[in-house]
Amino acid sequence: MSPANQRHERVGEEIAHEINAMLAGELKDPRLEVSVVASEVRVQPDMKHARVFISVKGTNKEQSDAIKALEHASGYIRRELVERLQLRRVPELHFTLDLSQEHVERIERLLKEMKKDNPPAP
């Protein structure tokens, strides 16, 4: 992996860490009272944009509301990242719902159902 790619990954990890710290207590929006976690951040090579994948435990409405709340707070989050990370340029943040955990849970549920419906042969 090239040093540039390593840097983007490191910056993405640092951004995710700081956003999670903000979610743990600094962001006071009722739409963020459900379990919300920045699961991954992908930073573009030019460092101008970052896709922030957000995992939300809740209903579809709660998930949608949490993404809207984060988009509304993106200016504040970005200013905080400037101070905390001391980067020359903090990327513009784009929040996306991370459905990977839901897919894992769905697959596990389907596998359990298959196992229950088809017991092992004696």
Describe the role of every protein-language-model region:
Residues 1-49, 55-122:
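Charge-rich, low-complexity N-terminal segments
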